[in-house]
Amino acid sequence: AGVMTGPGTNSYIIGTPDTGYIVVDPGPVDPAHTDRLRTATNGDIRAIICTHSHPDHSPGAADLKARSRNASTGEPPAIHGRPHGPNARPDSHFEPDVILQDGDRVTLSGDTQHTLQVVVTPGHTENHICLLLEEDGLLLSGDHILNGSTTIINPKDGHMGDYLASLDKLQAACEAHHVEFILPAHGHVLDRAGDVIANLKAHRLKREAKVKAAIDANPTGDMDTWVAVAYDDTPQVLWPLAKRSMLAHIDHLRASGEVP
């Protein structure tokens, strides 16, 4: 838990005793947390999926893999995800065993079936994915959609244009699969998925308009003067983080020619 992670990172366990389990976002290296995941799954983990490679999401995957086995094959579970992009921070480097592509499905079969469909959603990071649990109409949103705050878009690994486009993509996916609930990587479950996504996009665009207004009013200003105007509704202690997302907004505005 902390400023960047809120109440901590949510790990999700998908499956039943007869199908085995998929673990999504095993989190940082934390032996006690790994023990809890193994206990909850009886160690029968068929796949590990990381929504992205930030240090609060993916480093625990290797330890969980080493300490788990697929009960039907005796093999350790493969780590699934997308490799880090060229702009990732050193602490966010990640090379999965299985590289997931948009539309891929990771499936558990038994008396019931559990299907996770991959939705590639760059924006928070270049390698971010979300997951649709098809049978249950649930969206596992990683850090793209949070409960309690908006996610940080930290250039260059983070990209505001990609983030907004990915929100549109998630909106369409939720409509197509009748998704009502979003399971974020930080915070509690969100209901009314379509409204959440629409409101989040509107909030981002409203913030971008405030950033543009701050620059238009003071073209010779700097990040410190602009953040005080564009984020005047945000506690000052959070302005250093806000400046990272503000830079992503400025990059987006410059790309569209709205600011010099």
Positions of PLM-derived features:
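Divalent-metal (often Zn2+) His-rich catalytic cores of metallo-beta-lactamase-fold enzymes
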Residues: 138, 160-218
